[in-house]
Structures are given as structure tokens and as C-alpha cells.
Amino acid sequence: MLPTILSISYEHISLDLSKYQTAYACEGKKLTIECDPGDVINLIRANYGRFSITICNDHGNVEWSVNCMFPKSLSVLNSRCAHKQSCGVLAATSMFGDPCPGTHKYLEAHYQCISAAQTSTTTNRPSPPPWVLSNGPPIFGNGSGLIHPPGVGAGAPPPPRLPTLPGVVGISGNPGLFNVPPQHTAVTHSTPWSSTTAVGGGRLKGGATSTTTTKHPAGRHDGLPPPPQLHHHHNHHGEDTASPTKPSSKLPAGGNVTSPSNTRILTGVGGSGTDDGTLLTTKSSPNRPPGTAASGSVAGNSSVVRTINNINLNAAGMSGGDDESKLFCGPTHARNLYWNMTRVGDVNVQPCPGGAAGIAKWRCVLMKRMPDSGYDEYDDDASSTTPAPSGGDCLHNSSSCEPPVSMAHKVNQRLRNFEPTWHPATPDLTQCRSLWLNNLEMRVNQRDSSLISIANDMSEVTSSKTLYGGDMLVTTKIIQTVSEKMMHDKETFPDQRQREAMIMELLHCVVKTGSNLLDESQLSSWLDLNPEDQMRVATSLLTGLEYNAFLLADTISGSAVWCKKSKIYSSVVFPDTDQWPLSSDRIELPRAALIDNSEGGLVRIVFAAFDRLESILKPSYDHFDLKSSRSYVRNTAILSNDSDVNAGEIQQRLRILNSKVISASLGKGRHIQLSQPITLTLKHLKTENVTNPTCVFWNYIDHAWSANGCSLESTNRTHSVCSCNHLTNFAILMDVVDEHQHSLFTMFDGNMRIFIYISIGICVVFIVIALLTLKLFNGVFVKSARTSIYTSIYLCLLAIELLFLLGIEQTETSIFCGFITIFLHCAILSGTAWFCYEAFHSYSTLTSDELLLEVDQTPKVNCYYLLSYGLSLSVVAISLVIDPSTYTQNDYCVLMEANALFYATFVVPVLVFFVAAIGYTFLSWIIMCRKSRTGLKTKEHTRLASVRFDIRCSFVFLLLLSAVWCSAYFYLRGAKMDDDTADVYGYCFICFNTLLGLYIFVFHCIQNEKIRREYRKYVRQHAWLPKCLRCSKTSISSGIVTGNGPTAGTLCSVSTSKKPKLPLGVSEEAHDDPQQQQQTPVPITEDAIMGATSDCELNEAQQRRTLKSGLMTGTLQAPTQTLGGHVVLERGSTLRSTGHASPTSSAGSTHLIFAHKQQQQQQQQGPLGESYYHQPDYYSWKQPSTGTGGLKTPREYYNNAGAAASSPQQAHEVFYWTQKPNSGQHGKKKRGAGGVPASPSGSLHSRTAAASQVLFYPSYKKTKPGQPTGYPQYAEALDPPLATGNAAAYYQQQQQLRRQQLHQQQQQLSSDEEQAEQHAHLLHLQRRAGSQQQLPAPPPHMAQYQQEFMQRQYRNKHSNCDLGMGDAYYNQGSVGGADGGPVYEEILSNRNSDVQHYEVGDFDVDEVYNNSVGTGVFNNMRAAVAAGGSRYGGGSLSGGSVSSRSQQQQLKKQQQQQSLAQQRSVRRCTADDDDDEDEEEDEEATAAEQLHDSVCDEDEEEDESDLEHDAHGLPPQSDERMRRLMAMQDEDFKRRFQRQLRKHGAPLDYGALPPGAGPQPEHNGAVFGVSGGVGEGSMRGAFRQQQQQQALNAKSPGGRLAVNELFGHGNSGPPLPPANQTPAQKRQQLQKLSPQSTTSSSSHTSHSNPNLHPHQLTHPHPHQHPPHHQQRHLSAMLDENNTVRCYLEPLAK
């Protein structure tokens, strides 16, 4: 490494000053001396040898001689350099000889550059001090500001450890702060009136005299970066030299001025490595010939450009005057010295305080003010307000007239935020040495000196005297010298005891001296040294103490070892807790390390613990107070020309030594590699606002801390545990965190912090949306285990995101830190467990019957809950019991301490759950692949596709979540260790976490067609949402029902309206009345009807009579006007609604209740005040107007067959509903309470009944346009093919065509869920079919088409095959001569309701009275199975031709046999009244076996039918597996329900029984009941309570009603007419079939004698027709979404 040259000036006061300079060259290098042209060299003195230990001693060798001198050195130099402009001399022993072998020498020359014409120089300055001119060693302390330029000394020390500062570090062609080329600097003895300049290279300018020395500029004693390169441009002429007596304060301000050659150059910040040189540097153009002028100079003048960090101060007008007075450091007192005012950039030099020899120095620099100073940064825009310069300033260079003025303003703006400051915090007294320590140094070098006496005196001096920086260097050197001499002198003592005693005493003195140096009272002495010297002194102290300790260990004999109870140690711990109970720092050496370093069975170990050494052995840039260092480093580029340099961008990593220094050494050497690492436990000195601990050791060679060979095992708030594979001095380094930023986000840059907030926010929002979707739209989802699993997963993820967001904002000192870590641990374990259970559930679904029908699995879900949360809480509890501190010892509140407990309780469980989830996922894929190769039915294919999609999404979900958690973990670990890859993991976490939230929303919400539909409905139904979301081109989505005012009940909408149609039955006056027209609602589209939110309610407005129609508004009384047998009510008067949400379905499951703008007709009023309504057909107002321009009445429409036949058929839309008056109370009947219930309104929908008293709302099921109407009496007129006589062929062809279309439509369904739903409808419909009935005879003129009418069964849009003959009860109107009869549908129950299915035979009165329910029921079931066999086995419904007479006769025989079987079953029920319960159970078992066999036979026949359908390319009729499952479910329920009936059976009144249990010889359809989730928990309990209550009070029927009661009132209420008949029409039709007396007699008998035996009523006289009040039943089905769908049975013709 090349040395560099530096100049140190001594202050001279003279009118004619000659510069005195000093040059050095290390041994083996060439000393070059050069003066300016016209000047010659005048040597004063020279020496080849060594007078200082610091010059040319980069490695700090203290054993060289410092009294080495070659006497003829000056003569040799004079022969080479005297009176020459330049010369070069090689510093080598071949030139000068070897005055001191073994010592590295250097050549030192003191000279002057004088004019060649000058023969003598007269000066008035005082003589230099003797130590300058003498041959003795200079009192320049270690590295006393001597910088070695290239080519002169050893290599330069390494650059300071500073991070790269943007905009400051110099690059090629632009030297910056840390890339300073070697240059010569001058140190000025700073008196206010002194003015000298030292020019680099030893060239003297302006005739000034100076002394110069050499210095190395690469490092600073204060650890700060060296100053930037300063340029001082000169324009010299031999004869043109300004007067040296001209004061600088009188220099004019302004543009280019002539200034003396000795004008100072101001600097901005810090100087070179050691403080012996000022930043007053000048730079001349090399080898510039005489007479040439520099750029920008004025002829005849010497122009000097003054700069601070390349800022032209001449342009700023600061070359003199009052502005320059601001750039001075004020006078102050420090270290018993008075420091006078000093110019910025100068170094104030003065003699050391009293009692010490040498010089003291202190530099004045510019430092930026603190943020609270109130000064603002410079604004470049302010330059626009700079006044224009005067014209006189632009005479010589008009092109550069404006820039100097603008530049002056810029400089003023930049400099105003800075203030002159003494730097460093204390003066540099490295060269100050006390006289008594100099005396001790002389004594120790004497041969006959007493080492013990010297050591005692040294300990006394260091404890009682004031020391300076130079004294530290001398003291540590004496300690090493004493130890070396004692090592040689101990052999002169023959007595072992005397030898040990002397060395023990010497060690005590050395330890006392070291303790005195580290005492707090001597802290100022350490601060007198620059950082480099501090490190050297500390290293020397450590090595000296260690050397003396080993000296004692070598001296003590083995017999002197104290005896212990056990002499064999597995390990050694220092310090011993018994001896040092207050120490918390520990070093533990393993046994293997002791054995490897033993000698003769003994091991020499030296332990040392140092106090306050951590304040000396500081890392770089921490030698002065933290506030000043932060300000200094932040403003290193204070005056850079680059205006983009922002001080805030310069980020400095401040590190401190945050533990005591503890040392351990073995006898073989200092750096011994150990076979097993040692363990150190070090206590943190500072616990607040510190982070990132690092285990380090002190490197003796580099004089710095190093982390090689040491690693951090664990850490917490107070301690850190380290592991090192070698021995030396150890400590902990930690980063200082700003007090205002002490959370985890301190390691985030601004952008990453914002991105993390955004990422977590997005994920939380989408998780909340998913949870709300599960809650609000619960009717869409099946209440299954999968839904519960995903709900739990989302809850865990939400907790993790929120806890992570809270944890990164907390510190380890926060009270919530430990709790956050605990809950986060539990949430992560629970989340991974739920993922494992989700994969297991998919696997179990594929391996069980759950593939067919996904239902609620409460036991399994409860087991998942127990395993998930139970295991997680157990693991966390165990972790807390073992080591609670593991949750509080980490730096961040989102991580546990990385120890064995962390891996056992966190990593291992998470990995187990993830591996299990992946394993079950792969098993599920294998099973799906196997099933895909086998032949499955449509239902299994649909469910398999759904499960396949769920598994794919779950697997992607699992991988994405793993990526999120792994990236977060590695990011936090990397940021803690300051790893460069931490930012990569951080941005990966941001991306993955955002994708996780988006994936949750897309997977669970967007991809589900049902959810999308519910979202649309939900948006349409809420008026608070913006219209842009709720409105569309064709519909308006929100219907707002107002309850006040005269227009109450109308639908408020903004949709596109059609032309209002005149309601049926409204007179012409009403049509002409504008007020009446306003009350007529405006028809809107179906979307508006579907989107309406109001329930069907009573109009509570005050009663008033309409002017024209005479109707009563707000009541349910029968109106006064009728039209054609129709009793007309005004729309909007009695009821106000266009549709409503089903009370027990989900919020979005809205079904159309009745068509908008249609009249409601009150049929009759029941005994309890019920009013029965139906809505007549509204074909008339949908059809185009005829030529007459008026609307037709229903009778006129149907009488016009030709017009009906030619008009396009519309969808069938008819419905019934029932209302009860609001009694003001709607409480439910309490258990055990007798009497009449508070209100009959609590039967089905307690919530809706409370407000609107609507009990049941069956909505319509539309038939396809073009299908035959459902009106039997008009079927002939509306069906043209029937008139042609080709009905059989026509309907056969139409049936085949429709089945193909339906099959094609099913294949084009939009989703697997829709296919599953369609298929479930078919299966449930066929399984819920009752027994076959005797079909009524067709009209006489249609008798020849009897078989065709039987074939034409109604097909709703969900069917994919024909309904069987067992469904005849379902479409009696169709069989009687009308195809496509109306079917009414409504969702009655969902998750919260308990739905059960019943057969009408279960309520049979005979069986209840005779306690023989089971026999009758199963005989009926056998009849139903027989009907099913004929249904699936025969060809009447297979789609082929069935027009032969033999098939018709066979079908009649089967029907007769079934009728006889029903009669026999009833007789058997009567005959077995006295049988006991055991026999009944046997019969039940026998019937169950027969049922099972029948179902199996039916399945075989069904398979054959399926093959026949497959041959025609049509879908199969049903699913065998589903039918079998449902049959078993029905069988089990029937047994349990019949037992309940027998337990509570009692003689019941006719009116108290359900309507389905009355006399019904033909109707045996399926009915069902619904309870609202209360009572005894099921419909069976509710029905049992109903029976008991009705048995007690027969005249007050109440409680919960079966649905059948609403439509089949038997003897207790009026019947409900079909859609196309009024009661008058029905009575006329019945009177044609039977005499009026028979009907009256039957009706009178039924009402007057309720105590007759039910058997007598069940079998009336064969010539006696049934009463006109025929019962109507409902068919119920439960689809896979747990949705009950009801179908109203049309009344037989």
C-alpha cells in the first residue's frame, strides 16, 4: 500500500513569511521534494531513522525503537536537493546506512521553498519550539494526524465502514465524499489574524513560510468520511503577487476579484482521517508554464476561486466583508483550554494543558441545523427573485453576467441552514502526554529498573492524576513492556514461591491500572483520542492483560491448584455464580474444547470481564452522541451542487455495543478453533429502541468488531445467546431504532409499508364478504359439513390477518405483544387443521353415499370443531406451560422465538396438517379417476363433477395460503438478520396475500351461479344502493311498498311500464274515472315482481268506500258487486303486494306469489274469519284486444274457442292464498297449556303471520307456452288435434318430441348445481307419489281417447321423464281430460324448519280409533308398490303406442285390483282392533320386508325401463340408488311416527283431526307438515300437541296446522275451488251428477252427527255421491338444498 504525503503547518506571524514544510518517506520509498518555478529548496534538517512510533507504522507495532537516527542524513539530502527546484531521494539503508536494525525506518526532511533571487529571509516570528527543531522524537501521538501520501509510506487503512450514501459517494470523474484522491492539506495555527496557505506538493505560494508534515487522508479519527475534494484555482505570475499585508476583510464582493494567493479555502464538512490537517487546500494546475493565466482571470491580477464542496463563493460574494464573519466557530472552553474564534474549515492548534507536552487541535466545520431550528431547505425557485447585477459587473464577460448573481443567491440559500460547529465533540489531545508517564516510559526501558515498582507507580498515577489522550497510548505500551520483561526476568528467581508472588503482584498492578483506565473518571481521556487511536489503545490493553494473565498461569505449579470436590468437569462456566452472583453474562466451554487444549492434564484458561469497555470499543460512527452523529451523517452532502440530493435519503445504520465485553482464552493462542462451539449468554445494556442483535468478537488485527465464526442462537428483550467456534473477546452489537419508529414497520421502507397495509386490507375485505355471503344467503347453500368447514377457515384467516396487522405495529415491550403471538399461534394451527379436515371430508364424500345427497352432518362437524380448536388450544397451553417466555422473547410480536419449542409446537403441527391435507387430496384424485372410468348415473356424475371442482379449488387454496405464510416468515427472519433477500420475500408476501383475498372472493362467491343470482337480487331489493346498481334496461329491481296514504299498497318503481289494462269486473264508470285509474297499479316486468320486498299484508288504512265500485278498502268483507259469478276485489285495496320473499326461505329466495295487476276474488269466508281468495286467469288482458276494443271476461274468453285456438297460449299463472284476521296477538301455544291458543296465526309462518297474517303462499308453476290449458271443460275447444280424431298419434308424437327437447335442455344447463337440482326434483316427485286411484271417467264425447288422456300427464320444467301412474293424484285434472294441469309451488321451509313427510293413511280415522295404523298404511303402500310396478313395467308411459284395446282393458283390471286391495286393507284394519302391540310390530316388520322386496322389484323393472329409454336416446326415468335411500328413510320415519300416534291415541273428534284423516275413499296422496323450529323440535311433536289439544277441545281447532288443512277443510270449512271454477259453477256441476237431497243429507249427516264411527263415513252408499266439499291435497318434495316444494292437487272433475 502506498503512503501519502500530508503537510502540517505551524503558525508564523510575519510580514514576510517563508513557508516551513516537512516531508516523510517510509523505508523503501522515494522522497520527492518540489517547489514552484522560480523557487529553490532550502533544507533545514533531516533524519533517516525513527523518532515516532506512529509514522509509517500501519500495523501498530510498538516494539520498534523510537530513538533511531542517522547523523549524516542532512548531508546526504543537501548533496541531492540543496538549491534545486525539485529532487528525489530513495529512503533506504543503501543510501543512509542502518542505524537501528530490526526497526522499520523513515526519512524525514524539513525544508523551505525560497526564491532563487532571495539570499536571506527576515522574519519577526518567534522561534519554533525546541521539539520542532531538535532531533528528539516528535510528540505526535499514535497516528497524530500524519497522513501518508501514495509513494511515501505503507498502505492506507481500509475505508470507513459507512453505507453507500446516494449522491455523495464519488464515482469516476466525480470524486465524492468517500472517494477522495490524495492531496496535500495545510494545518493553520488558528489565530484570528493569521493568514497562511500551504500548497500541496511542498510548493510555497506567495512567499509565505510554513512547516509541513505528512498525513494519510483515507480515514478520519472521528470515524467520519473524509472531506470531498476541494479545488483552489490559482493564477500565478512571477512578478504579480498581491501584497500579503492586504486584509481579506476588505476584499470586494462580486464577480471575479483579485485576492492574495494565501486566501483560505472554506470546507463544508469533516476533514481527512486524522485531525492534523485543515481542509484549507489549494490545487494548482500541474506543470503550468510561467505567464499562462487560469480560466476566468483578469490580466494583471491573481484570481483565486473560493469554493466549499465545489460551490463558487466568489460568485456568492463571500470572499470578504461581513458575510464571511458568519462562517466562524465561536470561542469556547474545553479540556482546560480556551479555544478562540476559528474560521470554518480551519483547525485550531495550541499547546497542551499544563503538565502535558504536545499540541491540542480542534476543527471548525459546517453542520446542518437540527430540524427544529426553523430553517427551511433551499428552494431553487427563489432564484427567480434575485435582482439583476449592475452593468459594471458584466464588462469583461457578459455571457456569464447572470449566473454569478444567481449562484450567489443559491449559495446564500444553502448556507443559511448550516451553522459553524466544533468537531468532534471534544478537542483532539492525542499528542498530549503527561510528564510523569513520560518518566515511567523512560524507566521501563532502563535495564536495571524494578518492574514491580514501575507497575505500582503506574497504577497510582492512573488513579490520581489527570490523563490525556496521549497518556493512554503510553500506559498501554508500558503494560506490554512490563509483561515482556517479566517473562524474561522470572527465570532469574530460583525460588518458585517468590516467582509466583512477584508475578501475582505484577498482575494485580496491571489489572488495577487497566481498571483505572476504564474508570468513568477517565472517560474524557479516551475522548481525547480519535477513534482509530481508541481502538489501538483498547487492543493494546486487552492483549496486555491477557499476556499478564497467561504469565501467571504459566508460573503457577500444578500442586498449587485448589482442591475441589470433583476435579473432572464436563464443562467450565464463567463467571461462577457463587463468586459473582450479580453477573448475568456467562461463557460455557464444552468438555471437548478443554481436552483438546490441555497440557499434562491441565488446561490454562483466562477469563476476563470488562466494565465500560463497551463505551470505548464502539463500532464506526458512534464515538460521539447519537443526536450529533445522526445529524452529521444525514447532512454529509450539505453543500453538494446536485440539487436532487436529499438529506433524508441518506440513511445511516447506527449500531451500538449493547453488552459487556467478556473474554476467554486458552493457553495455545488467542484465535484457537474449537471442535465444539462455546455458548455465551450476554445481557443487553439497553432494552428500549434497539433491535437486530449480532454476536461479534474483537479482531486484534483489524481493530474492529467481526461476526465471523459467531452466530445468534436466540434472543429476547433482555438477553442474547451466542455460539462461537473460537475464543477471544465477545459482545453484542445492536441497531438503534428511532424512538418514534420502534415497531416492526421500522424495517419497511415507505413503499413496502403502504403495500402491506393495502394487501392486508384487500384480503380482510374479501374474507368478510365471503362470511357475509354464507350468512345472508344461507338458503342457497346446503347446510353441510363443507359449508361449516369453509366458514371456520374464513374465520381463522380473518383472525390471522388482523392479528398480523396488530402485531407488526407493536413492539416487544408492548403489553399486548405476548397475547398477540399466542392468539396468532392458535389461529394458524386451527386454520391448517381445518384445511386438513376439508381434504378429509372430500375423501369421505367420494367413498360414501354422501356423493349422492349432501346433507347436514352435525356429528361429523362437531368432531371437526373439537379436533381443530381443541388441539390448537392444547398445543398452545403446553407451550405456555413449558416456556412462557417463548412468546415474548422475539423482536417482533408476530413470531415466536426460534428454539426447540417453536419447532415442536408450531412447525411440526403445521407440517403434519399440511401433509395430511395433501395426502387426502391425492387420494381423492385417485378415487375420482377410478369413478370416471366406471358407468355412473346422472346424479353421481353431477355430484362427482361438483366434488372434483371443490378439490381443485381447495388444493389451489392450500398452495396459495402456504406461499403467503412462508413468504411472511422468511421475510421477517431475513429483515431481522438484515438479509438482502428480505425485500424479495416482502414483496412476494404482498402479492400472495392480495391474491389470497381475490381467490376467496372468486372461488366462493363469483364462480357460484346461485350466489351471483342472489347478489343481483340482493342489490335490487335494497333501495339504499345507488340506482346505477339497481336499475337495468328492462327492469327495475326494487319495489318499495308504502303503508300510508290513499295510495298505500302500490308498488313504487321507475321501470318501463306498459299501457294500463282494465281489471276484470270493473265497470265502465271506473274505467272512465281518473281517480279510479290512479288506484290501478302499473304493470311492470317480472324482474320487478321478483325483486319486490314486501310481504302480502293487510291494508290497515281507515275504512272508506270507493266512489264508483262500492268496495271497502282495508277490510276483508265481501264486496257488493259480482260479475259473471266472479266476486271482484279491487287491486291495491285489500292486498298490497306484487310478490314477496318466502317467510322461511333465505333473504334472496324471492318467488312470485301472484301476477301483478290482477284482481283477487274472495271465494268464501271460513268459521274463524279466514278469507279465501284466488286469482282468476288473466289470459284476457294478456291477449291482444279484439276489434271491439274491450277486454273480455273469463266467460267470454273461454266461450270463444276459435279465438282461443288461434291465439298464442300463455303461461299458466293462477294461485290461491289464505288470510286470517289480525287478532292483535300471535303468540305460540305453550306446552301443557289448555284452551284456545292466542291466535291461529302461528300455524306455519310465525314471523310473517305476525305482520300480515298470511299463513300459506303457494306460488304458481308455469307451463310452457303452447301447451294445452289446464281447464278440463275447455280442453276440447283449445286442442285442435282432438277434433281431427288423431289424438293418440298426435300426443304420442308430441310426447316424444317434448322428451327429446327436455333431454337436450338438461344437457345445456349452465352448471352442475342446476343439473343436480333438476334431477332431485324428479326423484322426489316420483318417490313422494301416493297410491294409485280410480280415475274419473272422461267426458262421453272423449271416451275413445281415454288412454291418451291417461298418457297426457303434466310435465313441469324440471322433469326429464314421464310421471308414473302413481302420480295420478297429482294431476287428476289432467287425467280427467286436461293435459298440463296447474301446479302450485312455494318454498315453505329451509334450514331453520323441521320438515317431515306423511302419508294420508297415517292420519286415517279408522286406524287411529282401532289403533291399527301400521297394517292399513302398509297395505296402502303395497298398493302403491303395485301401482309402481305397473307404472314402470307397462308400456303405457314408455313413450310407445298404447292404443290397443287389450292394453286398455289390462290397465282397467289393474285399477280395479288396486281398488279392491285398498278396501281389503281397510277391513283388515277394522278387524285387527284388538291386536296387541307385539303383533303390530311383527306386521310392521313383515310389511317393511315386503316394501323392500317391492322396491327391489320396482328397481329391476325400472332398470329395464331405463334400458328401453336409452335405446331411444332418452334419459332414464329415475335413479335407483336414490330411490332406495329414500325408501329406507321413509320406512324408518313411518315406524317411529306410528308408534307416536299409538302412544297418544285417543277417541278424536272429527273436526279435531287433520283434514287428511277424514272420509276419503279415493284420495291417498302425500301431505306434509312444517314447524318453525320450535315446539318439541319436529313436526311430529307439533302434530302430537295438536292432536292432544284438539282432543280436549274439539270445537276449537288451533295449534299448528298441517299444510293439508289449508286446502282440505273437510266438514269444518269451505273448499277451495280450482283455478277455472267458481263455487257456483262447481255446485251446478255436482248437482247435475247427483240429486240435491243426497248432497244435503250427506252434508247434514256429516255436520249433525260427528260421533258416528269413521268407518261409516269412509264407505258411503254406492249410489250416494260425496259432498261438494272435496278435499285437496299437496304434494311435497325436499330437494338437495333442503328446500321444501309444495304442489297443490287440482280438484278432480
From Swiss-Prot:
Gene3D superfamilies: 1.25.40.610, 2.60.120.740, 2.60.220.50, GPCR, family 2, extracellular hormone receptor domain, Rhodopsin 7-helix transmembrane proteins
Residue segments, region GPS: 695-740
Composition skew (Basic and acidic residues), residue ranges: 1508-1521
Spans within the Extracellular topological domain: 1-753, 809-814, 883-906, 976-985
Family annotation (SMART domains): GPS
Name of a matching Pfam family: GAIN
Site (Cleavage): L727, T728
Cellular component terms (Gene Ontology): plasma membrane
Glycosylation sites: N142, N256, N301, N340, N397, N641, N689, N716
Disulfide bonds: C695-C722, C710-C724
Residue numbers of Phosphoserine PTMs: S1142, S1239, S1246, S1310, S1311
GO molecular function, one term: carbohydrate binding
Ranges annotated as biased composition (Polar residues): 185-198, 256-265
Chief localisation class: membrane
Record PTM: Proteolytically cleaved into 2 subunits, an extracellular subunit and a seven-transmembrane subunit.
Annotated Basic residues bias: 1656-1672
Topology of the protein relative to the lipid bilayer: Multi-pass membrane protein
Family classification: Belongs to the G-protein coupled receptor 2 family. LN-TM7 subfamily.
Assembly, per entry: Forms a heterodimer, consisting of a large extracellular region non-covalently linked to a seven-transmembrane moiety.
UniProt name for this protein: Latrophilin Cirl
Gene source species: Drosophila sechellia (Fruit fly)
